Amino acid sequence: MPCGEDWLSHPLGIVQGFFAQNGVNPDWEKKVIEYFKEKLKENNAPKWVPSLNEVPLHYLKPNSFVKFRCMVQDMFDPEFYMGVYETVNRNTKARVLHFGKYRDVAECGPQQEVDLNSPRTTTLERQTFYCVPVPGESMWVKEAYVNANQARVSPSTSYTPSRHKRSYEDDEDMDLQPNKQKDQHMGARQAGNVGGLQWCGEPKRLETEASSGQQLSSLNLSSPFDLNFPLPGEKGPACLVKVYEDWDCFKVNDVLELYGILSVDPVLSILNNDERDASSLLDPMECTDMAEEQRVHSPPASLVPRIHVVLAQKLQHINPLLPACLNKEESKTCKFVSGFMSELSPVRAELLGFLTHALLGDSLAAEYLILHLISTVYTRRDVLPLGKFTVNLSGCPRNSTFTEHLYRIIQHLVPASFRLQMTIENMNHLKFIPHKDYTANRLVSGLLQLPSNTSLVIDETLLEQGQLDTPGVHNVTALSNLITWQKVDYDFSYHQMEFPCNINVFITSEGRSLLPADCQIHLQPQLMPPNMEEYMNSLLSAVLPSVLNKFRIYLTLLRFLDYSISDEITKAVEDDFVEMRKNDPQSITADDLHQLLIVARFLSLSAGQTTLSRERWLRAKQLESLRRARLQQQKCVNGNEL
């Protein structure tokens, strides 16, 4: 473990040291960032930092150094705070300078008060992000991060599990002890909000007594607080993230790894409750709007903790088996990549066999599933996203659990995924598109607010006859736009705003999908197990964990490989296409050439080759020929139904 735990348990003390040395000179801020950056470079240091993803909030010490793996769900308006402020001792008149960065509550002793008129006060700006755990993150990803984390934590003395669980009992106690409740609110009145920093005259007393007020505050909310997770059933903490530097580098839906100082000060809840009380004196309509915005933007810290960011990085991926940044020229990263690439061929062969079994013995469908799983939008030409490869697996058995168990297999392979059961009920009632709530001044999430490289599996086999209402039609349109243009149009009431995305869409259906797809492959099962669940479970249990991890590394790593086509091969492909057009002018089109080039690209990358070879081009033609022949055969059997 890194020597000296102060930077983990008392980071504000470290910051205070730099501030004391440099005073109002802004260099102290750069030195703080550099200090923590160097600390995290020490051997295995990041593993010793407690993570909000893995450690319950009540086990984390307030104002300790933590990390959080998250997606930016919303960005609030910038806020002003007191970067530097001065306190005056009421008895001795002694003046002390304090820093306000990385704090929600201003520090002042029992006999001190903030001098609001001090010429040395500095007002600065910070940005607030609303961040949620990565939507659809696979269980194996969570488990790997938990196993890697070596942070030693125990229940915090100021925020214990028993106190958290007794919230309703605390509320009853408050009713029975009105004098105690009155005293607490008297204490709260000594607090105030100045320049984005809460300040108080008796911080010790408020901190210890505020827990009951905090629970009362959360119980008094007009409705249960919605953590605004994009996907149903998601768990984990949402956080208000205060960003001080380079916030323009980040955007909504980015996946970030944050290192910063945890703020769960109970005083925040009392102060926010008081602000709601004060707003009730205003016009009723204005009061309602302000109260709703206040409720959303300043929720109880016990529900939505604050993180004051010291360091933040955008994550290329969330696969814990790979180095975080794959395009760095670090020797460690290069060694890992080159080592894995040297054994790529047997990994691909094993993965192909594994997916062939999962697809009931269909090796051609398994080939296309591999190509789909490593596909990614690598660039955009005008509005056209290049590299997307949506696959429609038709011929899936109806009234079977096959599609459900196939999704479970995919879940075990990719870092993040979601299965959308395409029923009339779901299409008509689920919220797909994020929309702006102007009353609360926040972006309300929808199912399609997903980070890059999420696998979205759409199961059409559950679709029955029925009527789509207007929201249902809008949802189908949203899915079509996502597949075709890799974008989601967020609803801002008065206008729509395009949010580009990079989502891998895989559609399972009985006949041809209602949705557009880049490629349709018709399933030809070679076996039909009498017990699908037992068959799929035995398939998963037969794979060694080490082999499964190789599959996971393979599918993530190949997305980031560069790819090119030499002039020589380009000429050969053009000549070949001209020859194909001569032989079959009716059915070979420019779209077919584009499809062949996409298949050839991902076929090459799946073999670890970053340039197209003649051999891979011929193999791509062979695969496409087999796929088209199978579709034609199915068309002959079922008429126009594919």
UniProtKB/Swiss-Prot annotation:
Region Disordered, residue ranges: 151-188
Record-listed Phosphothreonine modification sites: 160
Modified sites of kind Phosphoserine: 154, 167, 298
Extent of Polar residues compositional bias: 151-161
PANTHER family: MINI-CHROMOSOME MAINTENANCE COMPLEX-BINDING PROTEIN (PTHR13489:SF0)
UniProt record similarity statement: Belongs to the MCMBP family.
Role played: Associated component of the MCM complex that acts as a regulator of DNA replication. Binds to the MCM complex during late S phase and promotes the disassembly of the MCM complex from chromatin, thereby acting as a key regulator of pre-replication complex (pre-RC) unloading from replicated DNA. Can dissociate the MCM complex without addition of ATP; probably acts by destabilizing interactions of each individual subunits of the MCM complex. Required for sister chromatid cohesion.
Name by which UniProt lists this protein: Mini-chromosome maintenance complex-binding protein
Species of the source: Bos taurus (Bovine)
